[in-house]
Structure formats: C-alpha cells, structure tokens
Amino acid sequence: MSAHKAVCFLGSAMVTTWSSLFAPFAIASAFAAACPDVEVVFARATTEPPGVGQVGHAFVDSLRSQVRGRSVAVYPVNYPASEDFASSASVGAEDARAHVQATVTNCPNTRIVLGGYSQGALAIDLITAIPVSMAGFTPAPMAPEVANHVAAVAVFGNPLDRYVGAPLTTVSPQYAEKTADMCVTGDPICSPGSMSVPTHDEMFSDAHLSYVKSGMASQGATFAAGRI
C-alpha cells in the first residue's frame, strides 16, 4: 500500500469511527429537537369525526394563545366515539394511556395536558381516576410515575358524576389538584344522579353543546396554561 493510500485509508477509518461514536448522540439530539414543549392529548365527543372535535379545537387554540413561545403538539385520541359508550370509551382510554406512556418515554421533558369532552372525558377518567370497573367500562390506569409529567387535566361535560356521583376532582387522588372538571349549568350529561347511559337527546341538548359558546373551553385552557 502506498503512503498516499495509507493516509486515505486511515482518514476514512477515523471518520467512520468518529461517526459511529457520535451517531447515538446525534440521534438523541434529533429526538429531543422533535419533542414539543407541551402536548395535548384530547378525546372528542360521541359521533364527532376523527380529530379533537369542536371543544378540543377551541381548547387547543386558546391554550396556544396563552403559552406563546412554547411549541404545542396535539394528539387526537384514536377511538370510535360511538354511542356504544362503555366499549368505545374503554378503547379510547387504552389508546390515550399507551400514547401518554410513549410520550413520557421518548420526550420526558414534554409537559402533557389531558383533555376530553363528553364521552371523551370518560376516556380520560378511565386513565386518571381510581381504577374501579363500572357499568361495563374498563379502566386503563397510567403508571404512578406518569403523573409527574402531566401538567393539567381539563374535561368538559364529563359523565363521571352521572355514573358515580362525584366529579374527577374527587375520585382521582393523583390528578385532583391539576384537574378542571367543567360542567355547564343544566347539562344533563354531567349532572349527578342519573346512573344511566345518556340518551341521544341528552347528548345533543343545547346545554351539552354549549362548551365553546359558554367560554368554558377557553376557561379550561387558562387553567391548563397556568399549570404548564
């Protein structure tokens, strides 16, 4: 091997070696750069099309306007949102739980905001409340250490009070202080005492559909912004 070829070979080997050494750091940096400051995990209401729904959009828009300078990512919980409440909400809970755990693992510095409207609120209940089976719903509790990564929980028109006679702030010891459980006056979905599956008319009542117009979606965002 000539001296020139030897130098070229040695240089190539050194570049390869240094590249191998620094590749993991480069990959880690790329992942860190891709992690948002804040991630909203939001579950839409019954029969709304895939996405975060009308209340979710209002909530996210308001939150972004209040945390300017910070990146805000959004994850729409992937679930049927069908009128088969127990089965559908349980699927949503498992999807939300799995996504939150993945975010905590891959982006430990990201502050997570959980949210849900109507049936979507129930999906969030199932991952944050005391894990007790009720009316066919399947709890999907998050690991205790996840709570440190969750900045706030905001639920709207939450049927939990209807089913168990108490809001999420009462039945979720780990998340109570960081939770806003919002119910419009006269909303039959989140009013206590019924202990029955909401009817179609109740789900589409004027009160239950008023969370954007009433300003409660923005109020929930203000609560969340104050905890990020």
Spans of model-derived segments:
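Sterically constrained small-residue positions within well-ordered secondary structures
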Residues: 23, 31-34, 68, 144, ...
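Generic anion/oxyanion-binding catalytic loop in active/binding sites
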Residues: 21, 85, 142
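Active-site catalytic motif of lipid deacylating hydrolases and related acyltransferases
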Residues: 33-111, 185-228
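Fungal secretory targeting signals
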Residues: 1-32
